[in-house]
Amino acid sequence: MLKITIITLGNKMPDWVNSGVNEYAKRFHDGIQIKLIEIPLLRRNKSSDLARILEKESALTKDALPANARLIALDMLGKSFSSEELALRLTQLQQISSHLCFIIGGPEGLSNEILTLCDERWSLSKLTLPHPLVRIILLESLYRAWSIINNHPYHK
């Protein structure tokens, strides 16, 4: 069984986000287990020391990392994939690890410490995406790749 953990920094999401996440998570059948770990954002204001906040959020993220998982940072500068390329990459990764962990940063992104810990960096888009949508786009992209791998009609 493939385990997918998504660690995300963010505050309580609106119902439509949770509905989207739940919809894609339940579409994966018995072969894939999805787990979402939400780390609350630290308070920010105009006088906040963003470097210090990033350092603290980095420590919280590090504490949440599952042991023996392949760590994949979502980062604008990461590698981007077509749906078919992503399906191929997932097939390759399943032979390397049975646990993939995707990390979604906060408004300032991920710290260099977290990026260095990661085995890979992927980009969903060159656009800056709102954090609520990133969760849904990631799960939809993974589901689409899964449907390609399994010849499921969803992709076409």
From Swiss-Prot:
Homodimer. Gene3D superfamilies: 3.40.1280.10. It catalyses: pseudouridine(1915) in 23S rRNA + S-adenosyl-L-methionine = N(3)-methylpseudouridine(1915) in 23S rRNA + S-adenosyl-L-homocysteine + H(+). It is an enzyme of class 2 (transferase). It comes from Legionella pneumophila subsp. pneumophila (strain Philadelphia 1 / ATCC 33152 / DSM 7513). GO terms for cellular component: cytoplasm. Belongs to the RNA methyltransferase RlmH family. HAMAP family: 23SrRNA_methyltr_H. Keywords: Cytoplasm, Methyltransferase, rRNA processing, S-adenosyl-L-methionine, Transferase. Specifically methylates the pseudouridine at position 1915 (m3Psi1915) in 23S rRNA. This is Ribosomal RNA large subunit methyltransferase H. Signal peptide: none annotated.
